[in-house]
Amino acid sequence: MTSKGPEEEHPSVTLFRQYLRIRTVQPKPDYGAAVAFFEETARQLGLGCQKVEVAPGYVVTVLTWPGTNPTLSSILLNSHTDVVPVFKEHWSHDPFEAFKDSEGYIYARGAQDMKCVSIQYLEAVRRLKVEGHRFPRTIHMTFVPDEEVGGHQGMELFVQRPEFHALRAGFALDEGIANPTDAFTVFYSERSPWWVRVTSTGRPGHASRFMEDTAAEKLHKVVNSILAFREKEWQRLQSNPHLKEGSVTSVNLTKLEGGVAYNVIPATMSASFDFRVAPDVDFKAFEEQLQSWCQAAGEGVTLEFAQKWMHPQVTPTDDSNPWWAAFSRVCKDMNLTLEPEIMPAATDNRYIRAVGVPALGFSPMNRTPVLLHDHDERLHEAVFLRGVDIYTRLLPALASVPALPSDS
Ligand code: MET
Ligand SMILES: [Zn+2]
Ligand SMILES: [Zn+2]
């Protein structure tokens, strides 16, 4: 599809580009502007709008399209409003201008992760409302802050609040990842983020000496053990074509800290690791493994967790799950190929699943390179619009799932 001039641009694309220009970029997102944007959109669409301040300055905006049968549980469409930082010098276009090139690619931070999805939800609801539809189940759209830094001042708090329980969510959709092939990836579980800092203490002294028991030597041993484990998991993934990235445990060494001068042996050094633990791992045994690598390195080597998710959940992807049945039926009817996978990263879906709500991670972008968090993050307007079509089919099906035992 070739690009149209601005006067011919699809209004859904225009709204998408407007949202992309709001600078909700970490570490200082302009959440006020995002909330105002959704309030205004709610007004235009005739949707209920509720603001829940889960922490000072951290507002969850809830837009609601009531269903015809209030006894049924609702459909929750979640998206986060924050985006990750940019390295502006590596971008072909200003990442907050939402520039559209002559082919129709829209360049912006958040184009894939996940401002596209927020607008696709809204535009699908708009279309269905304009066509005069009503569905039995209520549809709530939640726009949440803070996901990109862990969701601790966003969804993690929101799911504990009475306002969340009052939504009576029976099923949720949240973000997925683009797929470069013709297929669409859908995520039914997630790896658990474990952020681990290993601190090593040892003998300080003059750096000209062969000092024994130094912090660096012991830290080196732990780093070796963990990177050997990384290599093992990588080989396991490489050698088995049936395994996807989310099915093995990954780890990266992301920070090294310590030292004051070239010629002073420091008494303390630390290494930080980002583990993503596969859902089928025995968590207790895995933690013991980490502890034993530290112990094997010598005295004075300890670890602490900056993040340690312990509640991985799996949403069934067979017809025993009526939500999956409805979701996959629509995709089949639309001739979309689905690739069910475990999310390699972490999303707010982990909090939603942990309070007992089945959830899928889905960002309808096929034939699209995976550019989330990358330079030149972009999405073709035709792929974006196709996503609106997909939600326009998914929402009626999900919001019409007949009464379930869990609804009463
Ligand atoms: C682990 S906190 C979540 C932040 C981000 N979504 C990630 O997966 O890294
Ligand atoms: Zn995201
Ligand atoms: Zn992200």
From Swiss-Prot:
Expression by tissue: Expression is highest in kidney, strong in brain and weaker in placenta and spleen.
ATP-binding as UniProt keyword: no
EC number(s) given by UniProt: 3.5.1.14
Pfam family, one: M20_dimer
Xref: CDD domains: M20_AcylaseI_like
Consequence the record notes for mutating residue 80 to A: Almost abolishes enzyme activity
Cofactor: Zn(2+)
Top EC class of this enzyme: hydrolase
Top-level taxon of origin: Eukaryota
Cellular location(s): Cytoplasm
Keywords on record: Cytoplasm, Disease variant, Hydrolase, Metal-binding, Zinc
Catalytic activity: an N-acyl-L-amino acid + H2O = an L-alpha-amino acid + a carboxylate; N-acetyl-L-methionine + H2O = L-methionine + acetate; N-acetyl-L-glutamine + H2O = L-glutamine + acetate
Ranges annotated as spanning the membrane: none
GO cellular component: cytosol; extracellular exosome
Any one GO BP annotation for this protein: amino acid metabolic process
Phenotype upon changing residue 378 to W: In ACY1D; slightly reduced activity
Listed result of changing residue 197 to W: In ACY1D; loss of activity
Ligand binding (Zn(2+) 1): 80, 113, 175
Role this protein plays: Catalyzes the hydrolysis of N-acetylated amino acids to acetate and free amino acids.
UniProt xrefs under PANTHER family: AMINOACYLASE-1
Family of this protein: Belongs to the peptidase M20A family.
Assembly notes: Homodimer. Interacts with SPHK1.
Protein name: Aminoacylase-1
